[in-house]
């Protein structure tokens, strides 16, 4: 099975810088299969980048509206149907930065996930525990609670991204055993909701300080791929990660 590699650009790059960066990645990695790469770019860039690079890469929105209507009086919102009209096939939902900075709760995230599914967009749903939950050994319960609000999605195409909050943007990373423990727990919870006659299409990726130095170890922890932040903004580290991932597939 090919590993999933999601590059989350967050609020980085001008449009011209984005085009130049993707051109460089393409030219320097012509011998690799880049079609499995998913770039989560600023929503403003989706249309232009898809026109230029749609045959080479997949693109993901970094967020989607919780509003169920396809259109209406909702200033600043971008509906799932609008993304689908651009042939965007992925959307990040519930990233810890949005949970923290924009107070997104379980109900909001569930609405966004449902909107994605109803529009044939694969949601990349982020879950993760704060350092307090890790220290007091309640992290599995914390993560299970986050998963419970989106259990309806487990029979659909969905990507679960485990990103421990305390690891994002830091030099700290869980051990391989820690990641494997969470992956196992996620699989166990999924299996409670998936009938035996339905194939499990849920994928699990790890995010949180993924780098060229630890990518090999992370991919041995039972994950289906990685969600990369700052390491994917640098050509050298992203190229190393791509080569490592494809060397293991």
Curated annotation (Swiss-Prot):
The keyword Isomerase applies. Homodimer. This is Triosephosphate isomerase. GO terms for cellular component: cytosol. It comes from Orientia tsutsugamushi (strain Ikeda). It catalyses: D-glyceraldehyde 3-phosphate = dihydroxyacetone phosphate. The active site is at residues 95, 163. Belongs to the triosephosphate isomerase family. Keywords: Cytoplasm, Gluconeogenesis, Glycolysis, Isomerase. One of its GO terms (biological process) is gluconeogenesis. One of its GO terms (molecular function) is triose-phosphate isomerase activity. Its EC number is 5.3.1.1.
């Amino acid at each position: 099975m090919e590993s999933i590699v999601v590059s989350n650009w967050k609020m980085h790059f001008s449009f011209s810088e984005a085009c130049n960066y993707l051109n460089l990645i393409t030219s320097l990695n012509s011998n690799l299969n880049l079609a499995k790469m998913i770039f989560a770019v600023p929503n403003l860039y989706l249309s232009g980048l898809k026109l230029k690079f749609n045959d080479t890469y997949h693109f993901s929105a970094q967020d989607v509206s919780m509003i169920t209507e396809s259109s209406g009086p909702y200033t600043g919102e971008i509906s799932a149907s609008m993304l689908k009209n651009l042939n965007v096939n992925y959307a990040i939902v519930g990233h810890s930065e949005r949970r923290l900075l924009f107070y997104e709760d379980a109900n909001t995230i569930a609405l966004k996930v449902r909107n994605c599914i109803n529009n044939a967009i694969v949601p990349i749903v982020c879950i993760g525990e704060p350092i307090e939950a890790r220290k007091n050994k309640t992290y599995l319960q914390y993560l299970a609670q986050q998963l419970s609000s989106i259990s309806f999605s487990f029979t659909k195409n969905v990507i679960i991204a485990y990103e421990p909050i305390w690891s994002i943007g830091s030099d700290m990373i869980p051990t391989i055993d820690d990641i494997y423990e969470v992956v196992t727990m996620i699989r166990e919870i999924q299996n409670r909701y998936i009938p035996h006659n339905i194939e499990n299409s849920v994928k699990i990726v790890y995010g949180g300080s993924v780098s060229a130095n630890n990518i090999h170890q992370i991919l041995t922890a039972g994950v289906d791929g990685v969600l990369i932040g700052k390491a994917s903004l640098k050509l050298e580290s992203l190229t190393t990660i791509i080569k490592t991932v494809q060397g293991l597939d």
